[in-house]
């Protein structure tokens, strides 16, 4: 797998997303050779920091968040129309709540709405109510300027990317020998708080963590490679004990919008690659 020759290296994620991995990209982009792998798979794509900075040619991305994935697909297929709709949205508080309340089946308007709310909401949180409606308040970003040039680059790159909405375990169908699977699943809290965390849309339970562990076993059985980012939590270390490389990391984080969840986080990278930090 090689880097895409079509896209400039300055392309970056077009969405803000809790748990994003820009910090990891900065640490490894100069030393980790993604081109050594035959394909790239990201079943928790979120904001796609790894995808957009490394820009692998043979890439498969997915997520269980259907609205997120439909936004990716529409950005790929109809970027000019998406940009035109975003340009028509205002920037005031009233404009924000008008857009938030829009109900439409038009895929272009839905994608434009998703991007608009993501960038102008409070902290870029993805949160929905019991009816599936986005309910994050205005973020007071009156002077925010959308980067339409970057959106166009993203669209061009996504032309060669397989995009699906599905459960993370189903990604195994496309994983073959010498593939790389990047697993950025939702985290537990730190070991001090000793609980499981909910951000974006759904709780990622201990049962889900066990399913993820089984997926890693299947990845390795196929002669492929994985990089898993997760919390430095005793139970997590037990679940993902594969006798592979475990790299501890301590860094500041601000998941979501609650001050109680901001501060120093202890994390781990689990991998059977030659990744070093």
Q: What spans do the regions from the language model cover?
A:
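SAM-dependent nucleic-acid methyltransferase catalytic core
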Residues: 2-24, 30-34, 76-197, 211, ...
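Conserved acidic-Pro-Pro-aromatic motif
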Residues: 178-269
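Flexible, glycine-/basic-rich loop-and-beta segments that form/coincide
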Residues: 274-277
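Short, glycine/acidic-enriched loop or turn micro-motifs at the edges of active sites
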Residues: 45, 66, 170, 187, ...
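Short, well-ordered beta-strand micro-motif
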Residues: 116, 269-272
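Conserved S-adenosyl-L-methionine
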Residues: 31, 37-91
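Short loop/helix-cap segments at secondary-structure boundaries that form the rim of catalytic
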Residues: 51-56, 173-175, 236-242
């Amino acid at each position: 797998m090689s880097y895409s020759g079509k896209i400039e290296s300055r392309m970056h994620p077009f969405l803000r997303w809790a748990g994003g991995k820009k910090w990891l990209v900065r640490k490894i982009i100069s030393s980790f050779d993604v081109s050594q792998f035959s394909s790239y798979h990201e079943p928790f794509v979120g904001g796609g920091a790894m995808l957009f900075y490394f820009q692998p040619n043979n890439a498969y991305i997915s997520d269980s968040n259907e609205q997120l994935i439909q936004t990716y697909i529409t950005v790929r297929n109809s970027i000019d129309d998406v940009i035109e709709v975003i340009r028509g949205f205002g920037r005031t508080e009233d404009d924000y709540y008008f857009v938030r309340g829009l109900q439409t089946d038009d895929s272009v308007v839905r994608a434009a709405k998703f991007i608009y709310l993501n960038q102008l909401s409070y902290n870029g949180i993805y949160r929905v109510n019991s009816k599936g409606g986005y309910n994050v308040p205005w973020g007071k970003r009156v002077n925010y300027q959308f980067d339409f040039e970057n959106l166009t680059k993203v669209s061009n790159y996504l032309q060669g990317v397989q995009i699906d909405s599905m459960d993370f375990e189903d990604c195994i169908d496309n994983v073959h020998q010498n593939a790389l699977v990047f697993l950025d699943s939702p985290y537990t809290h730190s070991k001090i708080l000793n609980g499981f965390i909910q951000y974006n849309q759904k709780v990622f339970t201990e049962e889900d963590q066990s399913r993820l562990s089984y997926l890693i076993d299947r990845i390795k059985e196929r002669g492929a490679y994985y990089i898993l980012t997760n919390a430095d939590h005793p139970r997590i270390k037990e679940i993902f004990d594969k006798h592979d490389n475990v790299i501890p990391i301590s860094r500041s984080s601000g998941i979501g919008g609650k001050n109680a969840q901001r501060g120093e986080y202890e994390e781990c990278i689990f991998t059977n690659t030659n990744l070093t930090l």
